[in-house]
Amino acid sequence: MDLRLPDSVPSDEEAAALDAVLGPTTGPDGWEREHGGVHRAATMRHLLLPALHALVDRVGFVSEAGLTEVCRRLDIPPAEAYGVATFYSMIPVQAVPPSTVYVCEDLACRRVSRSDAVHDRSARVVHAPCLGLCEQAPASLTVRCGPTPEHRVDSVVPLRGSVPQQ
C-alpha cells in the first residue's frame, strides 16, 4: 500500500456494502455526487472501521479495490487504512471461505480450548484473542459472510456444545 490510490474499481457487491454505510456516490438523477471535499471527509473518518466491516460482512474480505474505494470516499491514505485493516484479526485482506470460526485462545479459554471441536469442516479456523466470553470458556465465534442477510450469521457458541445463556 502506498500514499496514492491505485486504479482499481470495486465490485458491485463492494459498492453496495459501502453505500449502505457511507451513502451512495450518485444522486437520484444519476450525477456523481460531490462529497463535500476534505471537510466532509474529515467528519466521516470515524466510519473507517464500519466501512471495513461492511465489506467483510458482504464480500468476506477487504480487497484492494474495496480498500481503495473506502480511502477515496473518506479521503484516507491507503497505507493508513491498510494498517487499520491488518491490525484487526477479524478483518481478512485476502479471499477466505465464506465461513470462519474464531477460536478464543485467551487465558480462560486456552486451558480448555479445542479447535478440533469445530463442526463446520469447510470453515476457516482462526485462533483469535479474547472474544469476551470468559465465563463460557471455551468459546468460539462463527461468522458466515455473504451478499444476503441470511448468509451472514454471527453467532457465539461455546465449544462444549451447550447453548449460551440469553
Feature roles, as predicted:
Residues 138-142:
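Short beta-strand scaffold segments in enzyme catalytic cores
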Residues 1-58, 69, 78, 124-127, ...:
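Iron-sulfur (Fe-S) cluster-binding modules
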Residues 44, 48-136, 148:
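Small-residue-enriched alpha-helical segments and adjacent helix-cap loops
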